[in-house]
Design a protein with these regions (language model features):
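Cytosolic regulatory regions of ion transport systems
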Residues: 2-23, 33-46, 53, 59-610, ...
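A glycine-biased, small/acidic residue-tolerant capping/turn segment at secondary-structure junctions
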Residues: 622-630
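Short, flexible domain-boundary/linker segments around small modular repeats
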Residues: 631-641
Length: 679
């Protein structure tokens, strides 16, 4: 499309220039006529000189002369040419400017000139590496990019300038006082909406984030300035979260970016973990709680690097499709002992049960509804023992095991990957009579060999139900980073959470309730701790699973249950009420599986998912059910099964039972109600 547009523009200017040349020559012949200039040589030289000067805005035959000529002219031809010439005097210099610009652009292809004239969105990127190159390559027309990196080579700097990107080759962390203020002016901080911290060092990214909280920069930056920070180190991430939470009322908006996490989220969005069951599922009119309880997940992860670990953590959130479906994850790696020890730091052993003898991690039904287990296998997949293992732990009908219904090969080595795929294909063919028309999703990492990746994509029949896990180039772009729909949904969930306090002191005040919803959503989000933000992002991501489960009966009754005169909650505009003002009566309704079957199942499902997610973030339960949440110790009394959570009890002093938190598990249904209401 751009090429066609450029061709049309070039043709337009060429025709305009040709017209200008023709008119200038015609007027030259009339003005420098043979009577006044009898010598042909000088006559032609005057005509050419006038033409050259006309294209430089200094024609010998000016407007004053033309006005006299037109006034005294008796010939229609001379009059028409005269008027055309007066117009061309202004057109010719423009043609010259376009021609000069085109030549410069072709010789020195620098595109940065246009930012002087166009109001563009200002984005500042700190660091320069392969990930930043991918981000920059996705820049849109009205985005002005600034790259800040002291280690840029001259060749890299020239290449960036040629592509219209502003370069700041300096170490900003050493700047102080006025120097820092001048740096802010150079990167146009006052007009900046997003700052991307993408250095490969998480510690350096943290230092830059801290720099923007200095007094010299705090007042200059926009109120809505947002930071995207690349951080794939859990320890550094916790430090940054603590720093943000400590200053959260004045801290800049912060979102962590992990490339392995982006890849896994993209994979699960296209190929959900429940595909094996949903591939033969027919949407029904009526709710059937028992059907979803059979949607067990048996996930095989081969290769336990960052990608494999991220998939396991995401499976703890996205694998929950009912309050009781079994989740079993088998992980295979040749260096399992070291990787398992590192991965175990994600969990708290007061909540998650570690069995070193069996190489297993389990969350028991006492801690959360349903069953969840991870089994680690230390082996080299090139050997026969891998084939034996597949048949032992993945055979249909095996005791507590069953067929693998989702497989991910997360190995970087291409030869090992292809060998593993061959074994998995044999395994699936062995049990094709059991699988039948169902789809066993097989994701494979192939970014190291694009040719092989394209072959797999084109020959999905040969490698049955195999798909390639998106490489970083496909999941990393400025558009997806800035316009993240998941983040928008997370803010809505966070707002719903804040409006369910009923008769609590922090319930929305009338003046707050009168504010526009978009304003309230942003205000509530800005003052939330990072762990609450992460929790809301997790529930927003899982919403796709719940939407798949919502049959027609559910959608038809949302208004009756949550509308202005709802049976469960009452919609009061920008906040919710429970007309009976009694938390225990609401819990009775949520537990009434006969009267409210799908509501009862959805709240249990959501509570189980929340428990697993919090466990993956290192949180633990506490023995004292009346104890307040302890953020520093990552302790929460609500991390228990539903029966324990919904226990009733009398207030003990200032403490109260955690049953009042059951209402928060209604949030996914309330979000769906709001979406339906908005349509």
């Amino acid at each position: 499309m751009n090429k066609k547009s450029n061709k049309k523009k070039s043709l337009f200017w060429w025709l305009l220039s040709s017209f200008a040349v023709l008119v200038i020559l015609l007027e030259g012949f009339l003005y420098y006529n043979p009577t006044a200039y009898p010598q042909p040589l000088f006559r032609w030289m005057f005509i050419i000189q006038n033409g050259i000067k006309a294209f430089g805005f200094r024609s010998d035959v000016g407007l004053r002369e033309m006005s006299k000529i037109i006034a005294s002219s008796t010939s229609l031809y001379e009059t028409v040419v005269g008027y055309a010439y007066t117009l061309v005097i202004f057109i010719a210099p423009l043609c010259t400017a376009v021609a000069v610009y085109t030549v410069i652009k072709n010789v020195f292809p620098i595109k940065s000139v246009k930012w002087l004239f166009i109001n563009e969105r200002n984005i500042v990127v700190f660091g320069y590496n392969d990930a930043v190159k991918r981000l920059v390559s996705t820049r849109e027309a009205k985005q002005r990019i600034h790259i800040v990196d002291a280690t840029l080579s001259q060749a890299e700097e020239i290449n960036l300038l040629k592509n219209g990107i502003a370069v700041h080759k300096e170490d900003c962390l050493n700047l102080k006082g006025k120097q820092l203020a001048k740096f802010a002016s150079r990167i146009k901080l006052r007009n900046t909406t997003e700052i991307i911290l993408f250095d490969e060092s998480s510690a350096k990214n943290f230092s830059v984030y801290q720099m923007f909280h200095k007094e010299e920069l705090k007042e200059i930056s926009q109120k809505g300035l947002k930071f995207f920070c690349r951080c794939e180190d859990e320890g550094m991430k916790r430090i940054m979260e603590d720093y943000h939470d400590e200053k959260r009322l004045e801290a800049k908006d912060l979102e962590f970016i992990s490339i392995p996490e982006l890849r896994i989220k993209a994979m699960l969005e296209k190929h959900p973990l429940h595909t094996y069951h949903s591939s033969v599922y027919m949407e029904k009119e009526k709710w059937n709680t028992e059907e979803y309880k059979t949607w067990n997940l048996h996930l095989l992860i081969v290769g336990f690097g960052r990608l494999g670990q991220q998939l396991l953590l995401q499976a703890m959130n996205m694998g929950v499709v009912s309050s009781e479906n079994d989740i079993l994850i088998d992980v295979v790696d040749y260096d399992m002992q070291n990787k398992k020890s590192f991965f175990a730091t994600h969990f708290n052993d007061n909540y998650v049960k570690f069995d070193d003898a069996k190489n297993e991690i389990e969350i028991t039904s006492e801690k959360a509804d349903g069953t969840f287990k991870i089994r680690f296998h230390n082996m080299d997949i090139r050997y026969q023992q891998f084939t034996t293992l597949l048949n032992e732990i993945g055979a249909p009908g095996a005791d507590g095991k069953g067929l693998f219904n989702y497989i991910a090969v997360c190995i970087r080595d291409m030869d090992l990957t292809l060998g593993c795929m061959a074994e998995i294909e044999k395994y699936l063919n062995r049990y094709k009579d059991v699988i039948k028309e169902r789809e066993v999703s097989v994701g494979v990492r192939l970014e190291a060999n694009r040719q092989m990746a394209e072959y797999v994509r084109r020959n999905n029949g040969t490698f049955r139900n195999v798909f390639v896990i998106d490489d970083p180039e496909k999941v990393l772009s400025l558009k997806t980073l800035i316009n993240d729909e998941l983040a928008k949904d997370a803010k809505i969930f966070n707002y719903i959470y804040s409006t369910l306090s009923f008769d609590k002191p922090d319930s929305p005040k009338p003046e707050d309730a009168a504010k526009p919803l978009t304003v309230l959503v942003e205000e509530v989000w800005h003052c939330k701790e990072m762990y609450k933000r992460n929790s809301n992002r997790a529930i927003a991501q899982h919403d796709a699973v719940k939407q798949m489960l919502m049959v027609k009966e559910v959608k038809d009754k949302l208004e009756a249950y949550f509308g202005e005169n709802g049976e469960l909650l009452q919609d009061q505009g920008n906040y919710w009420t429970f007309i009976e003002r009694d938390e225990n009566k609401l819990i009775d309704k949520l537990n009434d599986a006969k009267e409210y079957p799908w509501v009862s199942e959805f709240v249990k499902l959501e509570h189980r998912r929340w428990c697993y997610f919090m466990a993956s973030c290192g949180w633990q339960s506490v023995d004292n059910f009346y104890q307040d949440r302890d953020v520093a110790q990552k302790a929460n009394a609500c991390m228990c099964n539903w029966n324990e959570l919904s226990q009733k009890g009398e207030k003990q002093g200032k403490k109260e039972p955690k049953s009042y938190t059951c209402k928060y598990d209604l949030m996914p249904l309330l979000k769906t109600y709001l979406d339906t209401k908005a349509k």
